[in-house]
Design a protein with these regions (language model features):
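Helix-loop junctions at the membrane interface of multi-pass solute transporters
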Residues: 70-72, 104-113, 127-128, 222-224, ...
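Hydrophobic alpha-helical membrane segments of integral membrane proteins
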Residues: 105-106, 121-124, 132, 206-208
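Predominantly cytoplasmic-facing regulatory/coupling regions of multi-pass membrane proteins
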Residues: 1-86, 132-203, 229-286
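Interfacial segments of multi-pass membrane proteins
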Residues: 107-115, 194, 198, 215-235
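Membrane-interface alpha-helices at helix entry/exit sites of multi-pass transporters
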Residues: 79-82, 100-101, 111-128, 136, ...
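Hydrophobic, aromatic-rich membrane-embedded alpha-helical segments
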Residues: 81-109
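Transmembrane helix boundary and interhelical junction motifs in multipass membrane proteins
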Residues: 62-68, 94-104, 203-219, 247
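Short polybasic/polar patches that bind polyanions
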Residues: 108-109, 180, 202, 209, ...
Length: 286
């Protein structure tokens, strides 16, 4: 199934994205000093706030998975979480939103009824429209904070908008926690700008895992608000790192669940310890 979804076009886009990253890496005159200072600044980031951001990212994934489950009417909640997680895992490494295609295929396979592909396609479109509306509310809230009340009205529109709105709130909380971790003033207002910037960068996901583009979009959005380059880059790097690590962990668990491969308890314990150690290590490093 994955071979059909991750076709030659995706592989070419991935190669092009990696080539772009390699070019930047081999041209030290481009942002070398700023990037170096940004990584140094991450040493002073608050580990506690980064943990909070990780928890918020996890909540956002569960809410997004619930939106897909509501749209496709899957009976098994855990199964829906797992299928959504596999898409998150693919998006962590592949460009062009390949994870969404994987997600579409997995949910279509499990959707009830005769028109499985149509049901999954409607779910993808419905979630996308709801997410776009929520992003619009966030942009409006940067000028009129009272607009955030509109997110509270989402349950009136149905379960899908409700879960998408909840995921949006969780993403804003994650962004605010990252901003607080690196010392950005007014972290909540910053988060209201960062989340739409990330979604805009997602339209040009030509690099694997959108590496570089997402951090750059965050940095540009923060600089427009007067945040210095070093802090802006630190925020972008920290946000992408925590989100990616959470996505990989969530997706790996989903893949393991769907594969139904018998795994010894010692292996599960060992894998859990490795993931925990990697997470703690990353928090210490940044």
């Amino acid at each position: 199934m994955f071979r059909d979804i991750l076709d030659r076009r995706t592989i070419l886009l991935s190669a092009a994205g990696l080539a772009g990253v390699a070019v930047l890496a081999l041209m030290p005159q481009l942002f070398r000093d700023q990037l170096g200072e940004a990584f140094v600044a991450l040493e002073d980031a608050s580990t506690g706030w980064l943990w909070v951001s990780a928890a918020a990212f996890i909540a956002a994934l569960f809410c997004s998975a619930s939106a897909w489950r509501a749209a496709t009417k899957l009976p098994d909640r855990i199964d829906a979480y797992a299928r959504y997680g596999v898409g998150s895992l693919v998006n962590s490494f592949a460009p062009a939103h390949a994870g969404d295609a994987v997600r579409l295929a997995l949910f279509a396979k499990a959707s009830p009824g005769d028109h499985k592909c149509l049901t999954a396609g409607k779910a993808l479109a419905g979630v996308a429209v709801a997410r776009l509306a929520c992003v619009g509310v966030l942009l409006l809230a940067t000028m009129k904070p009272i607009a955030l009340v509109l997110l509270l009205l989402a349950p009136v529109l149905g379960r899908v908008p409700m879960w998408v709105a909840a995921a949006t709130v969780a993403r804003v909380a994650a962004a605010a926690a990252v901003a607080a971790a690196v010392g950005v003033p007014a972290p909540v207002l910053t988060a209201l700008l960062v989340v739409p910037a990330i979604d805009l960068a997602g339209l040009f996901a030509i690099t694997p895992g959108n590496i570089g583009l997402k951090s750059g979009a965050i940095a540009i959005a923060l600089q427009a608000q007067g945040v210095d380059m070093t802090t802006a880059l630190s925020t972008g790097i920290a946000f992408h790192a925590v989100e990616t690590l959470v996505g990989i962990t969530f997706g790996s668990a989903g893949t393991l669940y769907l594969s139904r491969v018998p795994v010894p308890r010692w292996a599960v314990g060992g894998a859990t310890a490795v993931v925990a150690a990697a997470f703690v290590g990353s928090m210490v490093l940044v």
